């Protein structure tokens, strides 16, 4: 599918054993698309493919209902293994993500500022950092610009940032934008 809307439509209209879903879709965040697919077909396994850092997006994808998360740079090595594992009823995480999760368990429970954000606040952060206006973000998330403004205010407060320039700098420095 070339878009979130098309992916959701195809899943609703057809029967699939498994869905491979790109986290970066042109019309909507892949995590939001995943949530919609899981609302429609909760038992359908979905493996997320992404070019984004696993430690940033892998956990969010798994929490949203993904059965697996594969980074595109290693997809040729891991995809067959991931599909087999998910089709056998288990979840799949890459060795790199497993290592990151194990390391974080041993570290202090202090989270990085962006890890405190809700999914919508996180989406807002990424889109603001990418240069989108409040109106463009509202259209992308199918919400009002006023709601986007509330998300922006919350993320600024939670992350102790002052403006969109600081948001963009933070997102770039932490690998949260393309």
Please provide the spans of the model-predicted regions.
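The feature encodes the CheY-like receiver
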Residues: 26, 54
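Short, flexible helix-to-coil linker/hinge segments that flank and couple to helix-turn-helix
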Residues: 56-63, 67-119, 123, 176-177
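Active-site residues of response regulator receiver
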Residues: 22, 50
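Short hydrophobic/Thr-rich beta-strand motif most characteristic of the beta2 strand and flanking loop
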Residues: 1-3, 10, 161
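Acidic catalytic/metal-coordinating carboxylates
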Residues: 3-6, 29-32
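Recognition helix of helix-turn-helix DNA-binding domains
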Residues: 133-166
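Helix-turn-helix DNA-binding segment
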Residues: 111-146
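Conserved phosphotransfer cores of two-component systems
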Residues: 12-16, 36-44, 64, 174
